[in-house]
Amino acid sequence: MAKKIVGYIKLQVPAGKANPSPPIGPALGQRGLNIMEFCKAFNAQTQGVEPGLPIPVVITAYADKSFTFIMKTPPATILIKKAAGVQKGSPKPHTDKVGKLNRTQLEEIAKTKQPDLTAADMDAAVRTIAGSARSMGIEVEGV
């Protein structure tokens, strides 16, 4: 028989830097889950990822106090800002441009995000990422 699910916890945790302090500790503690077990498992799985890059994670809590977690890809906005070399998007995205991205940079971001996107093919994924970049005030070339 399958285990009974008590809830889902969605967090964004910096890669390789999970520790029992907030927001992780209180979120897992409320459900009675082993905080250190999650931190060790998460840090082990994110060893190959750039340290500090926020990784969205969905933790499934079960009635027997056990858990499983699924890691998603980093948010597109963070990958876009990193590729464009900017700290933050433009406060007036359609008038003030803060950076530039070309097609190859967009394709690289789309390849990273592909598992989490609903796009049918790579071209659709690139257009999705290009739209996100435009809404941040970053100029897009070649799309």
From Swiss-Prot:
<dbReference type="InterPro" id="IPR006519">
    <property type="entry name" value="Ribosomal_uL11_bac-typ"/>
</dbReference>
<dbReference type="GO" id="GO:0006412">
    <property type="term" value="P:translation"/>
</dbReference>
<keyword id="KW-0694">RNA-binding</keyword>
<dbReference type="GO" id="GO:0003735">
    <property type="term" value="F:structural constituent of ribosome"/>
</dbReference>
<protein>
    <recommendedName>
        <fullName>Large ribosomal subunit protein uL11</fullName>
    </recommendedName>
</protein>
<keyword id="KW-0488">Methylation</keyword>
<dbReference type="InterPro" id="IPR000911">
    <property type="entry name" value="Ribosomal_uL11"/>
</dbReference>
<keyword id="KW-0699">rRNA-binding</keyword>
<comment type="function">
    <text>Forms part of the ribosomal stalk which helps the ribosome interact with GTP-bound translation factors.</text>
</comment>
<dbReference type="Pfam" id="PF00298">
    <property type="entry name" value="Ribosomal_L11"/>
</dbReference>
<keyword id="KW-0687">Ribonucleoprotein</keyword>
<dbReference type="InterPro" id="IPR020784">
    <property type="entry name" value="Ribosomal_uL11_N"/>
</dbReference>
<comment type="similarity">
    <text>Belongs to the universal ribosomal protein uL11 family.</text>
</comment>
<dbReference type="InterPro" id="IPR020785">
    <property type="entry name" value="Ribosomal_uL11_CS"/>
</dbReference>
<dbReference type="GO" id="GO:0022625">
    <property type="term" value="C:cytosolic large ribosomal subunit"/>
</dbReference>
<dbReference type="InterPro" id="IPR036796">
    <property type="entry name" value="Ribosomal_uL11_N_sf"/>
</dbReference>
<keyword id="KW-0689">Ribosomal protein</keyword>
<dbReference type="GO" id="GO:0070180">
    <property type="term" value="F:large ribosomal subunit rRNA binding"/>
</dbReference>
<dbReference type="InterPro" id="IPR020783">
    <property type="entry name" value="Ribosomal_uL11_C"/>
</dbReference>
<comment type="subunit">
    <text>Part of the ribosomal stalk of the 50S ribosomal subunit. Interacts with L10 and the large rRNA to form the base of the stalk. L10 forms an elongated spine to which L12 dimers bind in a sequential fashion forming a multimeric L10(L12)X complex.</text>
</comment>
<dbReference type="InterPro" id="IPR036769">
    <property type="entry name" value="Ribosomal_uL11_C_sf"/>
</dbReference>
<dbReference type="Pfam" id="PF03946">
    <property type="entry name" value="Ribosomal_L11_N"/>
</dbReference>
